[in-house]
Curated annotation (Swiss-Prot):
Name of the molecule in the record: S-adenosyl-L-methionine-dependent tRNA 4-demethylwyosine synthase
UniProt remark on cofactor binding: Binds 1 [4Fe-4S] cluster. The cluster is coordinated with 3 cysteines and an exchangeable S-adenosyl-L-methionine.
Effect on the protein of changing C483A: Loss of function
Function: Component of the wybutosine biosynthesis pathway. Wybutosine is a hyper modified guanosine with a tricyclic base found at the 3'-position adjacent to the anticodon of eukaryotic phenylalanine tRNA. Catalyzes the condensation of N-methylguanine with 2 carbon atoms from pyruvate to form the tricyclic 4-demethylwyosine, an intermediate in wybutosine biosynthesis.
Cofactor(s) of this protein: [4Fe-4S] cluster
Domain Radical SAM core span(s) in chain numbering: 463-713
Enzyme class: lyase
Any one GO CC term of the record: endoplasmic reticulum
Pfam family, one: Radical_SAM
UniProt-annotated binding residues for [4Fe-4S] cluster: C479, C483, C486
Region (Disordered): 86-116, 156-176, 374-407, 782-810
Gene name tied to this protein: TYW1
Amino acid sequence: MDGFRVAGALVVGALTAAYLYFGGRFSIALVIIVGYGIYCNEASGGSQDSQEKLDLNKQQKKPCCSDKKIADGGKKTGGCCSDKKNGGGKGGGCCSSKGGKKGGCCSSKGGKKGGCCSSKKNIGDNENTATEVEKAVNYPVTVDFTEVFRKPTKKRSSTPKVFSKNSSSNSRVGKKLSVSKKIGPDGLIKSALTISNETLLSSQIYVLYSSLQGAASKAAKSVYDKLKELDELTNEPKLLNLDDLSDFDDYFINVPVENALYVLVLPSYDIDCPLDYFLQTLEENANDFRVDSFPLRKLVGYTVLGLGDSESWPEKFCYQAKRADHWISRLGGRRIFPLGKVCMKTGGSAKIDEWTSLLAETLKDDEPIIYEYDENADSEEDEEEGNGSDELGDVEDIGGKGSNGKFSGADEIKQMVAKDSPTYKNLTKQGYKVIGSHSGVKICRWTKNELRGKGSCYKKSLFNIASSRCMELTPSLACSSKCVFCWRHGTNPVSKNWRWEVDEPEYILENALKGHYSMIKQMRGVPGVIAERFAKAFEVRHCALSLVGEPILYPHINKFIQLLHQKGITSFLVCNAQHPEALRNIVKVTQLYVSIDAPTKTELKKVDRPLYKDFWERMVECLEILKTVQNHQRTVFRLTLVKGFNMGDVSAYADLVQRGLPGFIEVKGATFSGSSDGNGNPLTMQNIPFYEECVKFVKAFTTELQRRGLHYDLAAEHAHSNCLLIADTKFKINGEWHTHIDFDKFFVLLNSGKDFTYMDYLEKTPEWALFGNGGFAPGNTRVYRKDKKKQNKENQETTTRETPLPPIPA
């Protein structure tokens, strides 16, 4: 090595001299010489270190691994490297040979309990030994032998199936990995491994579906019947309509039974439908930090069957089923069978039966299922796709996903009620005129009655509203509750917030008036219409913003109310006490209603079936807003009584009144609106209270309010509508009730621009409207149905007697 360094030095010196001789710079030559010197020094130091390591290795091996001759003196104790001739010592040293009874840490193959470095041949290569010795010298630690003498565990004979979102994972997971989680730096669970020990055949199967036109309903019934035929099933399957569920959380955060298994049959619509709200709920639950991670891991499993039209809508083929499958998986559900996609045009019933048969065979597999969820899988797949080729993907694969490749509920804005939708057809059939894409107007039966002189609405008795000049309208056909007494029959959309296209308020009002007047014109040829009332009906004076849906959901509700006032139309706004922020910002209205349909949290959920989880807190906040921010408004609590649901606890109702302090409390018995099978409502005629029962409830309610020192009393009634009015005694001026409204004075005050309250536009309540007088408006003739039927029967009998028999033919 020294010879090479000398030769190198001579070469470098010669080159440097030649460089300087031909005019080179001295500084550069100096740098070259210094650099070469440093290089030689480093090379010399490295070789010296290597030699020291080898010497150290030899020194360490001598006492621990000496040969047979040196080990002759270790007969009794068996030295460090005692050999087989001398018995190796009874204790068997740390490097005892195969004769040792207890092989040490480096024993050979003869040791009964081989040590941590046992081997059939030599201990190892010199290089590995040198590295270990160096570590031992620099970092001296105590050697841990606890893992050395542990008995090896037996392997499982069978391994559960693993369903993973990451297809590249083929590892077999043992029984001990029943639950594992990976927690990210933000404290949230990024991945999890869950196991179901329930056998599929012993589970309780729920076939869940959503349907607008009946195809999905028939398909779900077919799946249900097919699964019901399985003799091996322990429990009979159950068939449920998603649209009839009062609370999705009972099934998709909690589970109805411990061994629940879901089979979802879902169509895909290009229009707004109840399925949109279901998907929105799943997405919110998956992204809600207040909801436990993976709540649906309590399920035995789930699978989804999607129905669609791959010919007409290839880009949206089964996209809602894909979304449901995605979000249920994100919530921790175990997919027991692949997502099914059936084209109803080309496949139809045959494909549904084929998918169901394969599902039935899968249910017979009793092996436990492990499902692996990894939140990073989506992002990793997206990165791989982004780094791949620029070829266009299949439209079926990208349908229903956002720009980032993940499912999103806000990727497309739909119309609330499209003209080609079943919802539009159902509403039209029920007598509504749909305005734009989300508003509606309908002529009230009391409007027809007053035009014919057969009576007026209860608002005439209680507040002086002329029914023949009142327009019932809603700027939002969607609602945030699914009340059991609602007459919408499940046809209207539901949502917690606005997610549709928005029509301008000017457009809604203009077309609402046109629609209302067109329906009034249809009354022109009806017998008994009073000409004077018919003429005035074409000048709308009042607008009841109720009808169906939730008007306060409309984003431009304040502008719409102001447009009504500009046309001299009063505003009667009804809300369901579920939107406190919108209620806080509402402008001046003629009268503000808040529906209080139950006095307790449990009963309110049972009656209103609200969509919000914090529905009770929202209602309480709305009551506080009425007492504070909106205390200048003329406020009314509206109670709809349903026997067997909310007529029990008057004390709890009094608590709510004490919290909100409304000016009036309007109590009305529920009206039965036909069959309730369409929207899952449990109401029958047995739940409709008689007028006497309503009076009894109102008297008990008033007594409880007075007992608490709240100044309320029974003021007016409309017995025909099963309706009574409790009013604050401040409206009883000089011993006379003033519950009616002076509408002309209201507009004078409104146009003046000055602040005013509800006490500034009062009008005396007429005698016929007071409690005890029935509330039937004069100038009308009440027609009793029983008498009408009796009279019609008598007229028919008279006609039969007077009509001569036809002549006998020749």
